[in-house]
């Protein structure tokens, strides 16, 4: 809807000023968070972290299209979307600090714990959406995944099941061009990910993942279609991951870093939004700086809350595997705790 210079391509008349400014505020908010989280990991204050810088428009545009009671199934790289959907910033940081409390969403929010194994959350989302259909609600689900996930069996099983039962789910792919170090050209022979929808007779949409307006519009349309009984949609949001796969990765070993540098100046979602606001005479530098400083203050408070959290109970590693503790785990737990007591 808007090009790299912030010029309107297909018109943004359906978006009011308040929503556009909120897009920008949220884009800035999650980028500030992402950069701070990388810094925290480098300082040893959280564990290995998966940055999402460059993918902000895909996450904000899709998350803000959801209704309050909808379901969200994120991956380990979609904490920006989770934050935009109302997840607690403290709990997101607790997750990256290795705490199970970080998987708990705010009261009334249907946010699944981040999917770490690739694509496993896709059948979960199809099932949750089907359950809402069976209950007769108007709730829909969105599930996030990367390009690499489309090579997994769970991707195909989830789409196949959702297609058969017409589950109200949006399969939201963020095509950031790399599955860790494997470029898209070595992952698949299809020209697009969106065309994979043809095998399941569901709509497939390819959208500029760095255009927050376009992402919001297409996700909103897919969710509305799902609520009205039209079934699932596959959305491919074409974007770019600027940084490493995780903070344990060195992207310089497998791709030209100059390419990322060039793309940052050309397709960056925040720069694009900023240019659009300027073209519309809506950009206020003082307001933009305030949005950034407010985000930084929110993050600092969340960090303080995370670091003040009581120490983890070592027994937790045994208590959340099965609904009821089975005897081998019970024995292991008792042995482990006795060893801790004697240390």
Model-derived segments and spans:
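Glycine-rich ThDP/TPP pyrophosphate-binding loop and its adjacent helix/strand module
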Residues: 119-308
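A generic structural signal for short coil/turn motifs at secondary-structure boundaries
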Residues: 11, 49, 82, 180-181, ...
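Short secondary-structure boundary/hinge segments and terminal tails
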Residues: 58, 83, 180, 215, ...
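Conserved acidic/glycine
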Residues: 1-58, 243, 250-253, 257-343
